[in-house]
Each structure stands twice: as structure tokens, then as C-alpha cells.
């Protein structure tokens, strides 16, 4: 533990908080264009083909975004909206694509948690 004199000479430094979503630049969402839509495999012990897209944002950042839900209509040059939120078993995927906004369609036949997947209320 430092003495009072040591603290006067060199005060305590505040810990720097690392930003988990730097590409958003403090914004809640950002718009971008898909440059590549592909599938990737998760880390051990999980096994699947997760749908992801490489996205060039309006601020020039190039990020990887996860496409949630079953089935999607995204392809190259699709305009999408992303939000923060990583996918724990996909290294490097720190953003989610928002379903039902811009060129991304909502999930079909979705009955529960519809707002998370951009699905309209069934009649």
C-alpha cells in the first residue's frame, strides 16, 4: 500500500474501460452494406453452421454481424442495420443484424418473441 507522499507524487490512475462495440461510435445502431454473406462454425464444444455477414458501415468500419433466426434473405449489397451484442461461440462476431429493418426481412411463422425477429403479428 503506497504512502501519502507516494500518492502525492504519482496519483492513482483510473482504470480505462474498454469499448466492446467500437464500430458503433456511441450510437445505438448503424447502417451498413453486406460485402459477404456466409456461414461459419462455432467454437468447441458447440457444432452448427452459423449465418454471418461481413458489413461495411457508413463510417467506414468493416465488421462481422450475426444473422439471428431461421432463414434469411440477405445477399451481397443488401443494406442492413446492426446493433451491438456479441455471439459467445463465434470469435470476432460482436454485432447483430436487426431483422425486419431495411433490406432484412423478419422471420417467417414466428409466434413468440416476434419483436426480436421483426415478425408481424399473425392474424
UniProtKB/Swiss-Prot annotation:
Query: What residues bear 3-methylthioaspartic acid in this entry?
Result: 89
User: Coiled coil: which residue ranges?
Assistant: none
- Does the record carry Transit peptide as a key word? no
> Which key words are in the record?
Methylation, Ribonucleoprotein, Ribosomal protein, RNA-binding, rRNA-binding, tRNA-binding
Answer whether the UniProt record assigns the keyword tRNA-binding to this protein.
yes
* UniProt xrefs under Pfam families: Ribosom_S12_S23
**Gene Ontology cellular-component annotations:** small ribosomal subunit
Its BP terms in the Gene Ontology are: translation
UniProt subunit comment: Part of the 30S ribosomal subunit. Contacts proteins S8 and S17. May interact with IF1 in the 30S initiation complex.
- Annotated family: Belongs to the universal ribosomal protein uS12 family.
Q: Which PANTHER family match?
A: 30S RIBOSOMAL PROTEIN S12 FAMILY MEMBER (PTHR11652)
Descriptive protein name? Small ribosomal subunit protein uS12
Upper lineage ranks?
Answer: Bacteria, Pseudomonadati, Pseudomonadota, Alphaproteobacteria, Hyphomicrobiales
